Regions:
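Hydrophobic membrane-insertion alpha-helices, especially the h-region
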Residues: 1-8
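Secondary-structure boundary elements
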Residues: 18-77, 139
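Extracellular pro-sequences of secreted precursors
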Residues: 12-13
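Periplasmic OmpA-like peptidoglycan-binding domain that tethers envelope proteins to the cell wall
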Residues: 74-89
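Alpha-helix capping and helix-coil boundary motifs
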Residues: 8, 45-49, 131
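Hydrophobic/aromatic-rich core segments of domains that either
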Residues: 40, 85-145
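Short, conserved alpha-helical segments within structured domains
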Residues: 49, 79, 106-108
Length: 145
């Protein structure tokens, strides 16, 4: 998969053409407790932690909505979300566990990338400033990343 144009989202509001993407990343108590619960049996194993959080998010049903991205808590409570809702949930979980992760916006889609310093997986990745970022797709189901 080759992306000729993409945006790394680092700000709460990112203007893209005629629209604005609203980043709903949360590092609150709710998200911290959820991340801790999802990773409690991982014993600080990075791959286990990331995979457990990704599995949780991908099990939430995908449903397109026309509103701005929802908060992580709202996505869990309503038990559905589109790519931006589910990506906001995943990146929030990753951030509270201190992982370096970013949103990537491509035409009509958003996904998460993560840097796993010192871990070399045999997986597709994006390179940003000579740093390897693995792609985490929140809309995939039953797929090991």
């Amino acid at each position: 998969m080759i992306y000729s144009s993409f945006f790394i989202v680092k700000n709460q509001f990112t203007d893209i053409g005629d629209s604005t993407y609203v980043n709903q990343v949360r590092v609150d108590d709710y998200t911290k407790k959820l991340a801790d619960f999802l990773t409690k049996n991982c014993k600080q194993d990075t791959i286990c932690e990331v995979q457990n959080m990704l599995d949780f998010v991908t099990q939430i049903p995908y449903k397109i909505n026309e509103s701005i991205a929802k908060s992580p808590k709202k996505v869990v409570e309503q038990n559905f979300g589109d790519c931006d809702d589910k990506s906001n949930l995943l990146i929030s979980l990753l951030k509270v566990k201190d992982y370096e992760a970013y949103f990537v916006l491509v035409p009509n889609h958003i996904f998460v990338i993560i840097n796993l310093e010192g871990i070399n997986l045999n997986k597709k990745a994006l390179y940003v400033n000579n740093k390897k970022y693995y792609i985490l797709e929140t809309t995939a189901t039953k797929k090991k990343q």
